[in-house]
Regions:
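Glycine-rich phosphate/ribose-binding loops and adjacent secondary-structure elements
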Residues: 1, 186-189, 196-198, 202-328
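Non-catalytic, usually N-terminal nucleic-acid engagement modules in DNA/RNA processing proteins
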Residues: 1-203, 314-322, 340
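C-terminal extensions of enzymes
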Residues: 1-25, 31-35, 47, 168-175, ...
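Conserved, mostly hydrophobic/aromatic
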Residues: 29, 61, 96, 157, ...
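Short conserved micro-motifs at the rims of enzyme active sites and ligand-binding pockets
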Residues: 105-107, 327, 349
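Alpha-helical packing segments of well-folded alpha/beta enzyme cores
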Residues: 153, 184, 188-191, 195, ...
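Glycine- and acidic
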Residues: 173-178, 182, 236-242, 355-358
Length: 402
């Protein structure tokens, strides 16, 4: 592992079992961990201004290389002074490599991400070929052919000026067989070297690079990937690829992956953000999580809530919420709950498709996640993380579980 103070440092303050509280020091300020990272997929967190996201307490967001390559393009963002200046965000930014999106076009699963682009674009997005050089695909905006390679991914992320760039990898689906997964993992490792070579020669000063662990649900392939990434000149590790068909299999995959990673390295779990998954992931020693769950739920009229039997969510559009004068969650400090907006009102504006409903629900969900992680950090420092996790899983709100 590389430890270049000019790029990024990771300091561990407290431990409680395998859970740990720390700080990622980036060129744009500290990020307290464990941390949940909201998605600013196209340069904004859906429904929120950058100032509002920071006001909730977030210190880092994730930008999407694939979407920002398609539009508005890295050159336009670079001319604006980089993604920080472009979106008015002066704290840390991590960018993914674009690999998940282009491979989802081939393997399925990207449709949910690009729904906001309009129905007319669905048929345009298509992967044309996966080669050693990279991946050829069609833009979902205009059907033009684009190429994303390890070098191009790093070039785009350099132009965006993120604090942390992720290497280009192939994200295999669960249904890929072992033989394909093995070939894919080996290719990801070759692409890792190409990413690092490009970044070493051309990368912007201060930009850290995280490697990505692949290997599917195969313990030997995961172990091999951990060894390759751990030996490389990277600043941290992200765990990607399929984690199984259900939460039990995900726990199993993480259980034999995380112990094979360097203890001092910051560990990032890609694309996972359910409340119970975060609680379990922190207990395993993971530090950073990103996911579209808070904003995706809000778009569909759902709010996070301390309801383990209901997957920690409320559907405010349901008829039973009409006439309910209670807040989404008692004592929640979000704009919806603290602002006096009842479930009854949120039911009405959600069912009538008012933009205010999405904004209030996004604010609530992001606040809930931020307080969940804040509580986890405090519990780790107090040596009480197991108790905190049990209370969350039993139905306590984050602000009541400490």
């Amino acid at each position: 592992m590389r430890h270049d103070p000019a790029r990024l440092t990771f300091e561990i303050h407290d431990r409680d079992g395998d859970a740990r509280r720390g700080t990622l020091h980036t060129p744009h300020g500290p990020v307290e961990t464990p941390a949940f990272i909201p998605l600013a997929t196209k340069g904004s967190v859906r429904g929120m201004s950058s100032r509002e996201v920071a006001g909730i307490g977030y210190e880092m967001v994730l930008g999407n290389t694939y979407h920002l390559l398609v539009a508005p393009g890295p050159e336009r963002i670079a001319e604006a002074g980089g993604l920080h200046a472009f979106m008015g965000w002066d704290q840390a930014i991590i960018t993914d490599s674009g690999g998940f999106q282009v491979f989802s076009l081939a393997h399925g699963g990207v449709a949910e991400e690009i729904k906001g682009s309009g129905r007319r674009m669905y048929g345009l997005a298509k992967t044309l070929g996966i080669e050693e050089e990279g991946v050829r695909f069609r833009s979902y905006r205009d059907g033009s052919e684009l190429m994303l390679s390890p070098e191009e991914s790093m070039r785009v992320q350099a132009a965006l000026g993120s604090d942390i760039a992720l290497v280009f990898d192939e994200c295999t689906p669960f249904h890929a067989d072992r033989e394909y997964t093995a070939r894919s993992t080996e290719r990801t490792h070759r692409w890792l070297r190409r990413c690092l070579d490009w970044h070493e020669a051309n990368g912007p000063a201060g930009q850290a690079v995280f490697g990505i662990i692949q290997g599917g649900t195969h313990p030997d392939l995961r172990k091999e990937s951990c060894e390759v990434i751990s030996a490389a000149a990277v600043d941290g590790v992200s765990i990607g690829g399929t984690l199984g068909r259900n939460k039990e299999e995900m726990a199993e995959v993480l259980g034999y992956t995380v112990p094979n990673l360097p203890v001092q390295s910051p560990k990032h779990l890609l694309g996972i953000g359910e409340v119970d998954d975060l609680i379990r992931g922190i207990a395993l020693g993971l530090d950073v999580f990103d996911c579209a769950v808070p904003t995706r739920l809000a778009r569909h009229g759902m709010a996070l809530a301390p309801l383990p039997d209901g997957r920690f969510r409320i559907d405010v559009r349901k008829p039973r919420e009409a006439g309910n004068r209670e807040p989404l969650v008692e004592n929640c400090p979000c704009a919806a709950c603290s602002g006096g907006y009842s479930r009854d009102y949120l039911n009405y504006i959600s069912r009538s498709e008012q933009l205010t409903a999405v904004r209030l629900l996004v604010d609530h969900n992001l606040t809930y996640m931020e307080r969940l992680m804040r509580g986890a950090r405090e519990a780790i420092s107090a040596g009480q993380y197991a108790d905190y996790g049990e209370r969350i899983m039993a139905g306590s709100a984050p602000w009541d579980a400490r």
